[in-house]
């Protein structure tokens, strides 16, 4: 009899929870319509994979790409709508969040054609790969719109779990297994540190979890200047530092970049930075509003360390992927300048603009590394010597992306850095901007060193990898080269006409 009553109570409780979830989805589902498109794409992929006897690979690519493009269209369709808070305060929709969601969707859309030939050559499981990419994209989008500490913790875990699985996708590779283990351990530790910081905010604010309500709670409890806030700030900064690969929390980054499949590295190198930057901006700007001087100082120190260590260690690398890993550590240091400046001197606008350029520059570089690796089986920097003599298109496009990463005019990277540094200078961050300028010069050195190798024509320097290099006979049918062309155009032309891009970015301030 007791068991029967307990069973009925369980059924009633489950029904109430289901009805509440259905009610929220029915009335608030329109606010996450782009995310719902991705969820539908995920379900469709699973259905086709489980019911089809003969795996039709083009359909999987088509469904994934179409879902991403439709999600982008849904975001653009509701552009400039009034900010809305939905799902009982857990999710916020505004232009600031949506532009970061757009950047994440753009990254994923470019990464899928970049991965096609690699997956076919390495015989990776296509369905699982696309499922992980779409799920990670979904987690990143929810993180951009998260409005409370619980969602901010859960959404990146959705992204991180897929990232761990993607980094260890080539199970037979010892380096991939090692990279996955390091990534998993460091990611778990950083999440624990982050949630510990949120627990301090929860207690100090009187039990609030929404970002704005945390501020109100701190005012009501008079704890906004207490030592506990400093403790929470330190823990949350360390947790975000791991997610952004800021020095000295960057130790996992080079090993994960080197050991993971190259298309996975291309995907993680941009999407994780975009999602974490959006989250960091909201966390520091809202709950820590009364501690702005403290978190400005912390981020300045981390940015300086990242720019110096990232660019100096990149000089000594012999692997292209490890070099780009340390380069990305330096690049995120530049992005931090925009977060510190804030919206007073167009700091957020310059940060968003530079991240848009960084996506094209970084993905363009990785597209060339994928293509070169498939045709030669190596990613050693010295093995690129003389590539121009065999494939001028690949060598020139790689050189353009590297020069744009270094910030040479008139490429997009130069104008992005110029505006970012100018905003920092106007905000009084003279020392930080000076370090940024000096380290940019250092980065140009190791990028030019690679370009010199690409253009060399001396036979004694050309390795057997380039001597035996074979180009694809059907250039128009190569999806990687399609991504390359898009990224080269985006790395060069937009820099000349930056004003429209900056104007759009300035409209995203929350």
UniProtKB/Swiss-Prot annotation:
Keyword Electron transport among record annotations: no
Q: Which residues cross the membrane?
A: 24-44, 59-79, 99-119, 124-144, 150-170, 184-204, 229-249, 295-315, 323-343, 354-374, 395-415, 418-438, 484-504
Gene Ontology cellular-component terms listed: chloroplast thylakoid membrane
Q: Which UniProt keywords apply?
A: Chloroplast, Membrane, NAD, NADP, Plastid, Plastoquinone, Quinone, Thylakoid, Translocase, Transmembrane, Transmembrane helix, Transport
List all disulphide bridges recorded for this chain.
none
Bilayer topology? Multi-pass membrane protein
- Assembly with partners or alone: NDH is composed of at least 16 different subunits, 5 of which are encoded in the nucleus.
**Cited PANTHER family:** NADH DEHYDROGENASE (PTHR22773)
Say what the protein does: NDH shuttles electrons from NAD(P)H:plastoquinone, via FMN and iron-sulfur (Fe-S) centers, to quinones in the photosynthetic chain and possibly in a chloroplast respiratory chain. The immediate electron acceptor for the enzyme in this species is believed to be plastoquinone. Couples the redox reaction to proton translocation, and thus conserves the redox energy in a proton gradient.
Indicate what this protein is called per its UniProt record: NAD(P)H-quinone oxidoreductase subunit 2 A, chloroplastic
Q: Which organism is it from?
A: Acorus calamus var. americanus
Give the gene name: ndhB1
């Amino acid at each position: 009899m007791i068991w029967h009553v307990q069973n009925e109570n369980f059924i009633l409780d489950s029904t109430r929870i289901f009805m509440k979830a259905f009610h929220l989805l029915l009335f608030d589902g329109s606010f996450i319509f782009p995310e719902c498109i991705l969820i539908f794409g995920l379900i469709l992929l699973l259905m086709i994979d489980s019911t089809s006897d003969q795996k039709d690979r083009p359909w999987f690519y088509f469904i994934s790409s179409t879902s991403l493009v439709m999600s982008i269209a849904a975001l653009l369709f509701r552009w400039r709508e009034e900010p809305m808070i939905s799902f009982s305060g857990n999710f916020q929709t505004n232009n600031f969040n949506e532009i970061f969601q757009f950047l994440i969707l753009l990254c994923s859309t470019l990464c899928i054609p970049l991965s096609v030939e690699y997956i076919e050559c390495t015989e990776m499981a296509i369905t699982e790969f696309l499922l992980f990419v779409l799920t990670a994209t979904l987690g990143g989008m929810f993180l951009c719109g998260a409005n409370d500490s619980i969602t901010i913790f859960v959404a990146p875990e959705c992204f991180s779990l897929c990232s761990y699985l993607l980094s260890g996708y080539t199970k037979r590779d010892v380096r991939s297994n090692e990279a996955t283990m390091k990534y998993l351990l460091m990611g778990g530790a950083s999440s624990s540190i982050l949630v510990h910081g949120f627990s301090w905010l929860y207690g100090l604010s009187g039990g609030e979890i929404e970002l704005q309500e945390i501020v109100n709670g701190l005012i009501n409890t008079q704890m906004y200047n207490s030592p506990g806030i400093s403790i929470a700030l330190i823990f949350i900064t360390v947790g975000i530092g791991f997610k952004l690969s800021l020095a000295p929390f960057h130790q996992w980054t080079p090993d994960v970049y080197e050991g993971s499949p190259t298309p996975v590295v291309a995907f993680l190198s941009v999407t994780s930075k975009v999602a974490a930057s959006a989250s960091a901006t909201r966390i520091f700007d809202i709950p820590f509003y009364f501690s702005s001087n403290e978190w400005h100082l912390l981020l300045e120190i981390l940015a300086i360390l990242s720019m110096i260590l990232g660019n100096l260690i990149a000089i000594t690398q012999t692997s292209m992927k490890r070099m780009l890993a340390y380069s990305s550590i330096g690049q995120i240091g530049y992005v931090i300048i925009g977060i510190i400046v804030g919206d007073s001197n167009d700091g957020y606008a310059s940060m968003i603009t530079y991240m848009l350029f960084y996506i094209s520059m970084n993905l363009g570089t990785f597209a060339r590394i994928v293509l070169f690796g498939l045709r030669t089986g190596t990613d050693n920097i010295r093995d690129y010597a003389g590539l121009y003599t065999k494939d001028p298109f690949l060598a020139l496009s790689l050189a353009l992306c590297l020069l744009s990463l270094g910030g040479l005019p008139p490429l997009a990277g130069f104008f992005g850095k110029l505006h970012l540094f100018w905003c920092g200078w106007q905000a009084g961050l003279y020392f930080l901007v000076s370090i940024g300028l000096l380290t940019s010069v250092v980065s140009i050195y190791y990028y030019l060193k690679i370009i010199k190798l690409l253009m060399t024509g001396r036979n004694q320097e050309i390795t057997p990898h380039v001597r035996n290099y074979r180009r694809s006979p059907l250039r128009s049918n190569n999806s990687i080269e399609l991504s390359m062309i898009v990224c080269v155009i985006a790395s060069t032309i937009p820099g000349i006409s930056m004003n429209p891009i900056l104007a759009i970015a300035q409209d995203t301030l929350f």
